[in-house]
């Protein structure tokens, strides 16, 4: 994997789909350090803008889905970096507490020295008077995903909270399946672990049309609460 990924890696993404029937298409470019788990990108809405909903519901597919950029500690095998040069895919369902539902599929590949992401989105049932469709979301709180192996692929589950006006939070559950394009026999699979993510929309460059985003991510065991039985 070291020969394919550098300390600074550029990436580009295409995200398209519909939310409550509204079609959109976004493109983005950025770079980051895969081994330190940090990345920044700029995303532009090239069709369907300005977005009539909060961009936040797409931002998790931009970066929370950019799994190459995670700093793993405690010797955890890096499933995603091992997957190159072939790459990997993931499928995710996100269920919001107000009834909103979003599905996403992402393909990660390597084109020369550049990571390429292609994302398809389908969002439905977001209430017209809710913070998503009213575009009143504030920020994502930091979140932790639990990650574990099932039949040669990785599964992830997490609870995320979107800060809204008045001190409220809109929560959502994410269920994701990660699939390497390499056979499981060619990979060293990680055990049960946690991945901490912090996603920040740094700037809305043009309202509903252009955003700058940052993420930091760390993969870890439960080291802060050590096991007396020697478990990770």
Swiss-Prot record:
Tissue expression from the record: Tentacle tips.
InterPro entries: GFP, GFP-related
Superkingdom classification of source: Eukaryota
Covalent link (2-iminomethyl-5-imidazolinone (Met-Gly)) residue numbers: 63-65
Residues the record marks as site: Cleavage: 62-63
Record's keyword annotation contains Cytoplasm: no
Biotechnology: Fluorescent proteins have become a useful and ubiquitous tool for making chimeric proteins, where they function as a fluorescent protein tag. Typically they tolerate N- and C-terminal fusion to a broad variety of proteins. They have been expressed in most known cell types and are used as a noninvasive fluorescent marker in living cells and organisms. They enable a wide range of applications where they have functioned as a cell lineage tracer, reporter of gene expression, or as a measure of protein-protein interactions.
Modifications after synthesis and translation: Contains a chromophore consisting of modified amino acid residues. The chromophore is formed by autocatalytic backbone condensation between Xaa-N and Gly-(N+2), oxidation of Tyr-(N+1) to didehydrotyrosine, and formation of a double bond to the alpha-amino nitrogen of residue Tyr-(N+1). Maturation of the chromophore requires nothing other than molecular oxygen.
Entry's Gene Ontology BP terms: bioluminescence
The entry's keywords: Chromophore, Luminescence, Photoprotein
Gene3D superfamilies: 3.30.1300.40, Green fluorescent protein (2.40.155.10)
Coiled-coil boundaries: none
Residues modified to (E)-2,3-didehydrotyrosine: 64
A matching Pfam family: GFP
Function according to Swiss-Prot or TrEMBL: Pigment protein that is intensely purple in color.
Family membership: Belongs to the GFP family.
Protein's name according to its UniProt entry: GFP-like non-fluorescent chromoprotein FP595
């Amino acid at each position: 994997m070291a020969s394919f990924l550098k300390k600074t890696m550029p990436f580009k993404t295409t995200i398209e789909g519909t939310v409550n029937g509204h079609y959109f298409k976004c493109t983005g470019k950025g770079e980051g350090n895969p081994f330190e788990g940090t990345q920044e990108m700029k995303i532009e809405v090239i069709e369907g803008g300005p977005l009539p909903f909060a961009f936040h519901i797409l931002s998790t597919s931009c970066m929370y889905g950019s799994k190459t950029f995670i700093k793993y500690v405690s010797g955890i095998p890096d499933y995603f970096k091992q997957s190159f040069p072939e790459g990997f895919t993931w499928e995710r369902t996100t269920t919001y507490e107000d009834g909103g539902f979003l599905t996403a599929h992402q393909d990660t590949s390597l084109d020369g020295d550049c990571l390429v992401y292609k994302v398809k989105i389908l969002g439905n049932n977001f209430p017209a008077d809710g913070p998503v469709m009213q575009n009143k979301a504030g920020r994502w709180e930091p979140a932790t995903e639990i990650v574990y192996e099932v039949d040669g692929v990785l599964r992830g589950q997490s609870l995320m909270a979107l800060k809204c006006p008045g001190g409220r939070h809109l929560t959502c559950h994410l269920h994701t399946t990660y699939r390497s394009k390499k056979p499981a026999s060619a990979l060293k699979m990680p055990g049960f672990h946690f991945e901490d993510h912090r996603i920040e929309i740094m700037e809305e460059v043009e309202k509903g049309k252009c955003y700058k985003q940052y993420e930091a991510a760390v993969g870890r065991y439960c080291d802060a609460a050590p096991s007396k039985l020697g478990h990770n």
